[in-house]
Amino acid sequence: MDSAGFEGSREDSPMPKLTRRDAGLILVAAGLLAPYSVAADGKPLAIKGYDPVAYFNMGTPTRGLPEFELEWDEHRYHFVSAEHRELFKADPVRYAPQFGDYCAMALAMGERDEANPENWLISDGKLYIFGKPAPMGPALFQQDLAANVAKANQNRPLIQAR
């Protein structure tokens, strides 16, 4: 037995050694993934942590930061700055994706598909996010925007109930 009360030595162990460097990398990786999951209170992170205001103000999908978090409509939103958080807080309906984390085109077709925050469209001042590969989702959705929005709104409660 060794001084810790275990038989055998580290050299005999079939498990590879975990170095301090490896442990540090594991902790860093865990920290990077943690903000993009469900919180301890059970509220999911909206649009995978992307800042909804950034689509409008920066013209690009941009990941928000946990330190600029706001809860709205049973979801947690992350923002790139306190300014973006305050803009959203003042008018969340303006900035939130129209169909939350669902692909807008899939809902219009009566299907359920998770949205990809990198595949998006702003039309008539509203943010739509798609799961289908660009440009299929946005291009197809925009061909008959009014009808697709109406179908998606009609199908959403049915899809959510599944």
Regions found by a protein language model. Give the residues of each.
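Short, Lys/Arg-enriched N-terminal segments with co-localized hydrophobic residues
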Residues: 2-14
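Compositionally biased, intrinsically disordered/low-complexity regions enriched for serine, proline
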Residues: 11-13, 32, 41
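N-terminal secretory signal peptides and thylakoid transit peptides that target proteins
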Residues: 13-30
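Hydrophobic h-region of N-terminal signal peptides that target proteins for export
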Residues: 29-37
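Charged, low-complexity intrinsically disordered segments
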Residues: 36-162
